[in-house]
């Protein structure tokens, strides 16, 4: 893990955020805390889920969590950053180039064409757990894992009440509190 790369990531997001909305965080300190430190803390100790895996970050936007995970777990086989906004994809391509991230691509296309393609999917702010699971189910390989980053368990409780609970097994839930902000990492594994 190279701290200089995380600092470079923060600088690039900060500068690009002046021109178009990548994040609501307006200072380098806030970007570092919320887009880097939180991801490093939430995923600490979970490298085994990423080694030699094909990973997708749905709704990647500013590159967190995907790029942060690629910097943290350099043995990710391939990282695909997916977003529906061309401007954000252009930024992500520039970001991956400036950070010298190999086997990392940013795409702006219908994600449905990627059936059974990913071992791991990450989602932070894209949508509800149920909606992201709907998208992710056909994208994941057999026994693939999806990581949801949320601020409460409300959406997980709704997921538990839904028919989707038969499609995914809960691997774990990890809680993290930082600066009066609560985050939850929910890991679900596809049932086949």
Curated annotation (Swiss-Prot):
<dbReference type="GO" id="GO:0070043">
    <property type="term" value="F:rRNA (guanine-N7-)-methyltransferase activity"/>
</dbReference>
<protein>
    <recommendedName>
        <fullName>Ribosomal RNA small subunit methyltransferase G</fullName>
        <ecNumber>2.1.1.-</ecNumber>
    </recommendedName>
</protein>
<feature type="binding site">
    <location>
        <position position="124"/>
    </location>
    <ligand>
        <name>S-adenosyl-L-methionine</name>
    </ligand>
</feature>
<dbReference type="InterPro" id="IPR003682">
    <property type="entry name" value="rRNA_ssu_MeTfrase_G"/>
</dbReference>
<keyword id="KW-0963">Cytoplasm</keyword>
<keyword id="KW-0949">S-adenosyl-L-methionine</keyword>
<keyword id="KW-0489">Methyltransferase</keyword>
<dbReference type="Pfam" id="PF02527">
    <property type="entry name" value="GidB"/>
</dbReference>
<comment type="similarity">
    <text>Belongs to the methyltransferase superfamily. RNA methyltransferase RsmG family.</text>
</comment>
<comment type="function">
    <text>Specifically methylates the N7 position of a guanine in 16S rRNA.</text>
</comment>
<dbReference type="GO" id="GO:0005829">
    <property type="term" value="C:cytosol"/>
</dbReference>
<keyword id="KW-0698">rRNA processing</keyword>
<dbReference type="InterPro" id="IPR029063">
    <property type="entry name" value="SAM-dependent_MTases_sf"/>
</dbReference>
<keyword id="KW-0808">Transferase</keyword>
<feature type="binding site">
    <location>
        <position position="59"/>
    </location>
    <ligand>
        <name>S-adenosyl-L-methionine</name>
    </ligand>
</feature>
<feature type="binding site">
    <location>
        <begin position="111"/>
        <end position="112"/>
    </location>
    <ligand>
        <name>S-adenosyl-L-methionine</name>
    </ligand>
</feature>
């Amino acid at each position: 893990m190279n701290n200089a790369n995380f600092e470079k990531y923060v600088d690039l997001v900060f500068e690009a955020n002046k021109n178009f909305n990548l994040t609501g965080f307006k200072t380098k300190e806030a970007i570092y805390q919320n887009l880097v430190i939180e991801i490093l803390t939430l995923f600490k100790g979970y490298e085994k889920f990423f080694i030699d895996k094909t990973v997708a970050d749905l709704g990647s936007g500013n590159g967190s969590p995907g790029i942060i995970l690629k910097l943290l777990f350099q043995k990710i086989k391939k990282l695909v950053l997916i977003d529906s906004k061309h401007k954000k994809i252009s930024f992500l391509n520039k970001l991956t180039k400036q950070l010298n991230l190999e086997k990392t691509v940013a795409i702006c296309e219908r994600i449905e064409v990627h059936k059974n393609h990913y071992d791991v999917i990450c989602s932070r702010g894209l949508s509800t757990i149920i909606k992201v699971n709907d998208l992710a189910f056909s994208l994941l390989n057999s026994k693939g894992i999806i990581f949801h980053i949320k601020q409460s368990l409300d959406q997980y409780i709704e997921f538990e009440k839904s028919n989707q609970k038969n499609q995914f097994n809960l691997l774990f839930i990890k809680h993290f509190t930082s600066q009066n902000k609560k985050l939850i990492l929910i890991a679900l594994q596809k049932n086949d």
